[in-house]
Swiss-Prot record:
InterPro entries cross-referenced by the UniProt entry: Autotransporte_beta, Autotransporte_beta_dom_sf, OM_autotransptr_brl_dom, Vacuolating_cytotoxin
One MF annotation (Gene Ontology) recorded for this entry: toxin activity
GO cellular component: cell outer membrane; cell surface; extracellular region; periplasmic space
Gene this chain is encoded by: vacA
UniProt signal peptide: 1-33
Written domain comment of the UniProt record: The signal peptide, cleaved at the inner membrane, guides the autotransporter protein to the periplasmic space. Then, insertion of the C-terminal translocator domain in the outer membrane forms a hydrophilic pore for the translocation of the passenger domain to the bacterial cell surface, with subsequent cleavage.
Organism: Helicobacter pylori (Campylobacter pylori)
Record function comment: Induces vacuolation of eukaryotic cells. Causes ulceration and gastric lesions.
Pfam families referenced in this protein's UniProt entry, alphabetically: VacA (PF02691)
Protein name: Vacuolating cytotoxin autotransporter
Residue ranges, annotated region (Disordered): 326-381
NCBIfam families in alphabetical order: autotrans_barl
Composition-biased stretches (Polar residues): 351-376
Length: 1287
């Protein structure tokens, strides 16, 4: 029975033929961002004419399953709907395989021969205007659909949610359509548990040869609750007008997916459009191989999930792939603000208004029928979510020999947060007229891990007029994308690279394989970072850049082929190293030139013959480290180095000769750099400055000779032509300035004289113009410099020069406002009374004469008597003061003594000089301010004094001993009980005393207490957990452990308590700066007793303690790092105590007040330190021993309640009245730390505690104690929690 169904609207595919027209205007040479902004994104985000919000969750689902309707198109209506339901049996055999077509579909699908296309095709029974719905939702098993080729419509909807669908097991399937006046769309939907594609699958193909009827559009929807998989041999082909919707947990397509495939001759004359929608795939979508285009300008779109992976992407030379990632948070629901309103309003004076606020008003009595179309909501482009990723292992383009003016462009466009191209890189197939590949991420980043190839060759080349072009654009819309290339890029001749981004990062770029390349980075708005750039005749369009190394080759073609930086480079551009490689000869020279810029900083510049550097259009160029020839030993060619304004930075070095061929058309500033003039043929080349020159110097001295650091050095000056003026520098105006004194000016005679002292002539490494003689070795060196063999062979004959500076009057110097020059007459010879000498200043010791090892870089002169000679300190060389003085920081010596004292000074001497040398000391103080030095020294001396202190070393033993003193006092209080509430015990004692006579006159209670045993079970075993801490300004120490003992009450001729104990505690210490950390294992053991004589109590105690300490020093600063080490030592103590007290009893002995006095002896000590450090400042020695004699006074209150419970408090003062001992100073190389101790200490102590009965014969006790040193302000705190068992 045929089932009729009310006509309803059927959505059409996103990329339908109507949309094709909108896309035709997009030529391959245009940016494919238009595909997003004008077609794809409005269609997805805004919905199309039906009013369906396709960019929303519900709208996208509707589009994914039924597709969006073509704009303003009357909906298709099926003439007839057939329905088939899988009946009994299909839901019973989950392992059975069925032929889907034979089992269910064949009864409602007809087939026949298409004479126009010479092929068989299939359609829904009754014609392509009908629909077949198959209800298999309860069916199980596997259903094969194989050989359903050329299915031309109408619609097919198969619901088999619990079953597996296998497409193409033995033969492929194709779902297509026939084009007619209605442009009818074929829609095929499969909903299964799993979908397996085993053979070819075609969508919207032409039937047969394709010469007959065209296809309209086809939508194939595959839904699988678990997964969709295709085999390696299963090729999926999407023809023009095809849409494939995939909805599943995961999609893995192992075979080739071909979008925009051709089927008939001539199809390449028009572009094709196809779409794959994977937005409803929750996991990763994996395309093993994706091909876009088939000799045609195919345009393909993938509506992507969060993560898309493509193994190999093949793009035809004019094809475009657009991968659209979902926005942050996915597609959201939009309110349905569009009514489905299509009827006409004919009521008099009635109006209708839709939700788009458009009001239609019908005039009175009008018979006109007005149809209100749905509102179309169109949103703009959006960025992919922050976790959206498109990964492509390799991109290939394919090309043929077609020639087109401007060439062809293939494109890949996405909006994902990250577009990653893997190790396979990018291959561009190039042909005549040129080919271009555009890779753009509209809103995110691009990363390329592999190489760029042309015709499968790294460094592949193209021909003139047929260039190969790579284009990468990151963050086109956001202007905040980063393009990163993690592999070296090698570009052959006529191969170009264009990158647009906010920031571009390159590992390396090599265009030196023949040149004629363009690197267009003008679209990078922030910074271009290149590790290594090799160029030859390359056009480099870049604004602000940071190039680690620039190597400029000559291309070997003709004169004038430069690497051209064709954009304004701005003011932030920098090149760490420039290397101009040697050209062949003048006709094959090359070079680099710049269009314009504010400033270029170059750290190192190495020039070579026949390679030019033209920076005349850059306002300022600064050389910060080195300016030299890369071929100084073989200067057979000439260079041409051209600048506008050039600055030689501080401590930079310029090697200059006639081969440099340096042109400065503006100003030259030598800002405390050094110019080395090389003598060639007896001459030096003149450095000509077009405008003004500034020679800025300082008061630093040369590290090797002790002279002022030269600003100009003439090497091999002995080869200069004699009796000739040698002009070193000429300018319209020359100014001089001393930055150390802050003076500068033009025509300043004093500054000119100072500058001349910084113009030095050398014979090898020996100064010619002045000799400083401190010993006979200096006499020999002077003789070698001036060519005086007598001074070399017989230095003793010239001892009169020792302690003097001798000036070579055969050399004269000129430094004025227009030139700097030297005039060489020949070397003069020193004589004993010939003058031309200046006495060197001295100090109180002869050590001042031997300064060579202390003359470290940047050390300025400190004595005005010889401003051109070596500095002589007021302090002995080899002292830390001399290093400060040479560093022109004499005031810091006073700061050091004022803030750190002699101990801090001695420690600095030990750390920097005694353990290293003056050179190391100079390096360290140059890097550290005076305030920081004193701060670090104070930290170190405080820590070292703490280490040496015997109080610190025995602190944990004292805390452990204090814990035990509290426990022992608690035991004595417990056993000294006179009060009982136990009536049974009292009655038993009375019975035992029956018929006894006593001589005493005390009360009955006193008699009972005196002659009664303290307990029925007088022997006790006890154990306590203990914890303690030592608190002071230098740090915090903590201790935890356990203590145990046994005691008993003895009732013989003498009434007494005797006991013994042992304890263990682990202690740790950290000072406030965390530079000292310690851990120690400690033991304590001893005996105690109390003797009773009526209300008199005599206490005696003896104990010993031993601790093994492991400590480490951990200073963070570089200045103190040599102190860092681990070390160990032993600490020990021994003590005896005796005291007397008298009990005052109240409330029938329940409350007892006991004052007491006592004396004690303590012996404290430690062994030498043993360090694991191999540095010269390893800790050693440090043993200490101290004997202490103390007197104490205490008051104790006890309260007894019940039969066993009690509480007590004890407070008192302990005063040392004598001490003596010895200590071995802690040694760190030459630095000593002597232990210091307060003469006589006073301690205050308070402790309290008590005991509760838990069960018969089992008791719980606890207590706390605090001891405070009133002199050193150190506190010790301890507590215990313990158990006692009585037996």
């Amino acid at each position: 029975m045929e089932i009729q169904q009310t006509h309803r609207k059927i959505n059409r595919p996103l990329v339908s033929l109507a949309l094709v027209g909108a896309l035709v205007s997009i030529t391959p040479q245009q940016s494919h961002a238009a595909f997003f902004t004008t077609v794809i994104i409005p269609a997805i985000v805004g919905g199309i004419a039906t009013g369906t919000a396709v960019g929303t969750v519900s709208g996208l689902l509707g589009w994914g399953l039924k597709q969006a309707e073509e704009a303003n198109k009357t909906p298709d209506k099926p003439d007839k709907v057939w329905r088939i339901q899988a009946g009994k049996g299909f839901n019973e055999f989950p392992n059975k395989e069925y032929d889907l077509y034979k089992s269910l579909l064949s009864s409602k699908i007809d087939g026949g021969w298409d004479w126009g296309n010479a092929a068989t095709h299939y359609w829904i029974k009754g014609g392509q205007w009908n629909k077949l719905e198959v209800d298999m939702k309860d069916a199980v098993g596997t259903y094969k659909l194989s050989g359903l080729r050329n299915f031309t419509g109408g619609d097919l909807d198969v619901n088999m949610q619990k079953a597996t669908l296998r497409l193409g097991q033995f033969n492929g399937n194709s779902f297509t359509s026939y084009k007619d006046s209605a442009d009818r769309t074929t829609r095929v939907d499969f909903n299964a548990k799993n979908i397996l594609i085993d053979n070819f699958l075609e969508i919207n193909n032409r039937v047969g040869s394709g010469a007959g009827r065209k296809a309209s559009s086809t939508v194939l929807t595959l839904q699988a609750s678990e997964g969709i998989t295709s085999s390696k041999n299963a090729e999926i082909s999407l023809y023009d007008g095809a849409t494939l919707n995939l909805a599943s947990n995961s999609v893995k397509l192992n075979g080739n997916v071909w979008m925009g495939r051709l089927q008939y001759v001539g199809a390449y004359l028009a572009p094709s459009y196809s779409t794959i929608n994977t937005s409803k795939v929750t996991g990763e979508v994996n395309f093993n191989h994706l091909t876009v285009g088939d000799h045609n300008a195919a345009q393909a779109g993938i509506i992507a999930s969060n993560k898309t992976h493509i193994g190999t992407l093949d793009l035809w030379q004019s094809a475009g792939l657009n991968i659209i990632a979902p926005p942050e948070g996915g597609y959201k629901d939009k309110p349905n603000n569009t009514p489905s309103q299509s009827g006409a309003k004919n009521d008099k004076q009635e109006s209708s208004q839709n939700n788009s606020n458009t009001q239609v008003i019908n005039p009175p009595n009008s018979t006109q029928k007005t149809e209100v179309q749905p509102t179309q909501v169109i949103d703009g482009p959006f960025a992919g979510g922050k976790d959206t990723v498109v990964n492509i292992d390799r991109i290939n383009t394919k090309a043929d020999g077609t020639i087109k003016v401007g060439g062809f462009k293939a494109s890949l466009t996405t909006n994902a947060a990250h577009l990653n191209i893997g190790k396979g890189g990018v291959n561009l197939s190039n042909q005549a007229s040129g080919r271009t590949l555009l890779v753009e991420n509209l809103t995110g980043n691009i990363t390329v891990d592999g190489p760029l190839r042309v015709n499968n060759q790294v460094g592949g080349y193209a021909l003139a007029g047929s260039s190969a072009n790579f284009e990468f654009k990151a963050g086109v819309d956001t202007k905040n994308g980063t393009a990163t290339f993690n592999n070296d890029i090698s570009l052959g001749r006529f191969v170009n690279l264009k990158v647009d981004a906010h920031t571009a990062n390159f590992k390396g770029i090599d265009t030196g394989n023949g040149g004629f390349n363009t690197l267009d980075f003008s679209g990078v708005t922030n910074k271009v970072n290149i590790n290594k750039l090799i160029t030859a005749s390359t056009n480099v369009a870049v604004k602000n850049f940071n190039i680690n190394e620039l190597i400029v080759k000559t291309n070997g073609v003709s004169v004038g082929e430069y690497t051209h930086f064709s954009e304004d480079i701005g003011s932030q551009s920098r090149i760490n190293t420039v290397r101009l490689e040697t050209g062949t000869r003048s006709i094959f020279s090359g070079g680099v030139k710049f269009k314009s810029g504010e400033k270029l900083v170059i750290d190192e510049f190495y020039y070579s013959p026949w390679n030019y550097f033209d920076a005349r259009n850059i306002k300022n160029v600064e050389i910060t480290r080195k300016f030299a020839s890369s071929t100084p030993e073989n200067p057979w060619g000439t260079s041409k180095l051209m600048f506008n304004n050039l600055t030689l930075g501080q401590n930079a070095v310029m090697d200059y000769s006639q081969f440099s061929n340096l042109t400065i058309q503006g100003d030259f500033i030598n800002n405390q750099g050094t110019i080395n003039y090389l003598v060639r043929g007896g001459k030096v080349a003149t450095l000509n400055v077009g405008n003004a020159a500034a020679m800025m110097f300082n008061n630093d001295i040369d590290s090797a000779t002790g002279f002022y650091k030269p600003l100009i050095k003439i090497n091999s000056a002995q080869d200069l032509i004699k009796n000739t003026e040698h002009v070193l520098l000429k300018a319209k105006i020359i100014g001089y300035g001393n930055v150390s004194t802050g003076t500068n000016g033009i025509s300043n005679v004093n500054l000119e004289e100072q500058f001349k002292e910084r113009l030095a002539l050398y014979n090898n490494n020996n100064r010619m113009d002045t000799c400083v003689v401190r010993n006979t070795d200096d006499i020999k060196a002077c003789g070698m410099a001036i060519g005086n063999q007598s001074m070399v062979n017989n230095p003793d004959n010239y001892k009169y020069l020792i302690g003097k500076a001798w000036k070579n009057i055969g050399i004269s110097k000129t430094a004025n406002g227009s030139k700097i020059s030297v005039y060489y007459l020949g070397n003069s010879t020193p004589t004993e009374n010939g003058g031309n000498t200046t006495n060197l200043p001295t100090n109180t010791t002869n050590n001042a004469r031997f300064a060579s090892y202390a003359l470290i870089k940047n050390a300025p002169f400190a004595h005005s008597a010889t401003p051109n000679l070596v500095a002589i300190n007021q302090h002995d060389f080899g002292t830390i003061e001399s290093v400060f003085e040479l560093a022109n920081r004499s005031k810091d010596i006073d700061t050091l003594y004022a803030n750190s004292g002699a101990q801090g000074r001695d420690l600095l001497q030990t750390l920097l000089i005694d353990s290293h040398d003056a050179g190391y000391a100079r390096t360290m103080i140059d890097a550290t301010s005076a305030n920081e030095i004193t701060k670090q020294l104070n930290t170190a001396t405080t820590t070292l004094n703490n280490i040496a202190s015997l109080e610190h070393k025995t602190s944990s033993l004292q805390t452990l001993s204090l814990s035990n003193a509290m426990i022992l006092n608690s035991r004595l209080v417990n056993l000294s009980r006179r009060h009982t509430n136990n009536i049974d015990s009292f009655a038993k004692r009375l019975q035992a005393l029956k018929d006894q006579r006593f001589a005493s006159l005390e009360s009955a209670a006193e008699v009972l207490y005196q002659f009664a045993p303290k307990y029925e079970k007088p022997t006790n075993v006890w154990a306590n957990a203990i914890g303690g801490a030592s608190l002071n300004n230098g740090g915090n120490a903590s201790l935890y452990g356990t203590s145990a003992g046994v005691d008993a009450y003895l009732n013989g001729q003498v009434e007494a308590i005797v006991g013994g104990f042992g304890s263990y505690g682990y202690s740790s210490f950290n000072n406030q700066a965390n530079s000292l950390n310690s851990g120690a294992n400690n033991t304590n053991f001893g005996v105690y007793s109390r003797i009773f004589a009526n209300q008199h109590e005599f206490d005696f105690e003896a104990q010993g303690a031993l601790g093994s300490d492991q400590s480490s020093l951990n200073f963070k600063s570089a200045l103190l790092r040599d102190l860092n080490q681990s070390y160990n030592y032993l600490a020990y103590s021994a003590a005896t105590r005796a005291s007397y007290g008298y009990d005052f009893a109240f409330f029938r002995n329940a409350l007892v007040l006991k004052p007491s006095v006592g004396v004690s002896y303590n012996h404290l000590g430690s062994t030498n330190f043993k360090s694991n450090s191999t540095n010269k400042v390893a800790l050693s020695n440090g043993s200490s021993s101290q004997h202490l004699f103390n007197a104490s006074a205490n008051v104790e209150a006890r309260y007894y309640y019940g039969d066993t419970s009690y509480f007590y408090m004890n407070a008192g003062v302990l005063q040392e009245f004598a001490n003596f001992g010895s200590s071995n100073a802690v040694s760190l190389n030459t630095f000593k730390v002597n232990a210091t101790r307060n003469p006589l200490n006073t301690h205050a102590r308070v402790m309290m505690g008590g005991e509760l009965k838990l069960a018969k014969e089992v008791f719980l006790n606890l207590g706390v104690v605090y001891l405070h040193n009133l002199i050193s302000n150190i506190g010790h705190f301890a507590s215990n929690l313990g158990m006692r068992y009585s037996f």
